[in-house]
C-alpha cells in the first residue's frame, strides 16, 4: 500500500486528498479571518511581496490551490489599476474554497478576466505551454504527490515561463525557531477551536508545515521536476519562503 503523510499520521495515498478537502471545506467560511489571526496579519505582507515577483501583468497566469483567491484577486486589482490586459485562471480541488473566491471577486468587482476551475494540482486540465506564470501560495504542501504537481507546473508553463511558490519553510534562528514552534503547536490550534470550532483542522495545518521540506530540499525537488534558475527568498526569518524557477 502506497502511504503518505496527512499531518503526522500515515495514510493511504488515495485517501489523503479527501482528508485535505474535508479540512478546507470545514474552515472555508472563516479561512481569511483565520489567516489574519494565525499570522498576526503578516500573510498580507508576504503575499504582497509574492505578487511583486510578477512584473508583467499582460500575461496568462494560473493560480493553483487558489483557495479563497487572495493571490489572484491581488493580481486582478493590480492589473485593473494599471489598465493591463491580464488573464487569470483560479484552480483549486476544493469547490467550497473556490466559492469563497468567486464571492470575493464579485464583491470587489474583479470578476472580469477571471476563470475558475475545480482541478487537482497533480492533473491540471490545461494543454502544454498554456501559461506565462504559475503561482501557488500555501498550497503545495497539501498536495499528496508534490513531485507530480511540480512536473505538471512545468508542463503547463510556456517556454521561459515562471513558477512562483509561497510556502511555509524552516526557521533557522534559534530564538525565533523556538517561539515559532511553541506558537504553532500550542496557540494556532487553540485559535482554530475558538474561531472555527475545529482544533483538529489546524493541528493538521501545523503538522503539514512541520513536515514540509526545507528551503534547499524543496529547491532540489523543483530542479528535478525540470525547472532551471531555481532559487528562493526567505521572509520573516524563514517562516515562509518564496521559491521561483523558469521552464526551459
Swiss-Prot record:
BP GO annotations: aerobic respiration; menaquinone biosynthetic process; methylation
Gene3D superfamilies assigned to the protein according to its UniProt record, in alphabetical order: Vaccinia Virus protein VP39
Pfam family, one: Ubie_methyltran
Disulfide bonds: none
UniProt binding sites for S-adenosyl-L-methionine: 68, 92
Protein family membership: Belongs to the class I-like SAM-binding methyltransferase superfamily. MenG/UbiE family.
UniProt-recorded name of the protein: Ubiquinone/menaquinone biosynthesis C-methyltransferase UbiE
UniProt organism field: Rickettsia massiliae (strain Mtu5)
Taxonomy of the source species: Bacteria, Pseudomonadati, Pseudomonadota, Alphaproteobacteria, Rickettsiales
Amino acid at each position: 500500500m502506497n502511504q503518505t503523510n496527512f499531518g503526522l499520521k500515515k495514510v493511504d495515498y488515495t485517501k489523503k486528498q479527501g482528508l485535505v478537502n474535508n479540512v478546507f471545506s470545514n474552515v472555508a467560511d472563516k479561512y481569511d479571518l483565520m489567516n489574519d489571526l494565525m499570522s498576526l496579519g503578516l500573510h498580507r505582507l508576504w503575499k504582497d511581496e509574492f505578487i511583486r515577483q510578477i512584473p508583467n501583468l499582460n500575461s496568462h497566469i494560473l493560480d493553483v490551490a487558489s483557495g479563497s483567491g487572495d493571490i489572484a484577486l491581488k493580481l486582478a486589482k493590480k492589473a485593473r489599476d494599471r489598465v493591463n490586459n491580464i488573464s487569470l485562471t483560479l484552480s483549486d480541488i476544493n469547490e467550497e474554497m473556490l466559492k469563497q473566491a468567486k464571492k470575493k471577486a464579485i464583491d470587489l468587482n474583479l470578476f472580469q478576466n477571471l476563470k475558475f476551475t475545480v482541478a487537482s494540482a497533480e492533473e491540471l486540465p490545461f494543454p502544454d505551454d498554456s501559461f506565462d506564470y504559475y503561482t501557488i501560495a500555501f498550497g503545495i504542501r497539501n498536495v499528496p504527490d508534490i513531485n507530480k504537481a511540480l512536473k505538471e507546473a512545468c508542463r503547463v508553463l510556456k517556454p521561459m515561463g515562471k513558477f512562483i511558490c509561497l510556502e511555509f519553510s524552516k526557521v533557522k534562528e534559534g530564538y525565533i525557531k523556538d517561539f515559532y514552534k511553541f506558537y504553532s503547536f500550542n496557540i494556532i490550534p487553540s485559535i482554530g477551536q475558538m474561531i472555527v470550532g475545529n482544533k483538529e483542522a489546524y493541528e493538521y495545518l501545523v503538522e503539514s508545515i512541520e513536515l514540509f521540506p526545507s528551503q534547499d530540499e524543496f529547491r532540489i525537488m523543483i530542479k528535478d521536476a525540470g525547472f532551471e534558475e531555481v532559487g528562493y527568498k526567505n521572509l520573516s526569518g524563514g517562516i515562509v519562503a518564496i521559491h521561483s524557477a523558469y521552464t526551459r
